[in-house]
Amino acid sequence: MSWIHVHAEDGADGEIAELYDRLRRERGRVSNILKVHSLRPSALAHHLDLYMGLLFGSGGLSRAQREMIAVVVSRENDCEYCVSHHREALAKYVKDTDLLEQICSNYRQAELSAGDRALLDYAARLTASPAAVAENDVV
């Protein structure tokens, strides 16, 4: 998938093998987006810590909300790989396949709670036009 050389899971050793093992334990597999860091294990470790903190850390957002935000940000960034990656995770929480497809293709047409719509509107705006976000958008 990537143009960047990656270390295969079955041939990995040392620090990268340990990180791949961690990923398989914690996530069940090693995603392609993380394999692209395999030439720099320290970058992979930092990316993994950030990813786990954002999507699985404590806080006021549910896993479904975090994955919806990730899908919307991925769509705004026009990254089909990222949309697909986060859609797969979101499908574990959104069982209505029509709703799932609406969120992934154009969340603005999906029947969402006011709170979820506000989260996604904010994420989309922050991604598309970060300089346009003002203090009153946050508080």
Language-model segment annotations:
Residues 1-139:
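Hydrophobic alpha-helical segments
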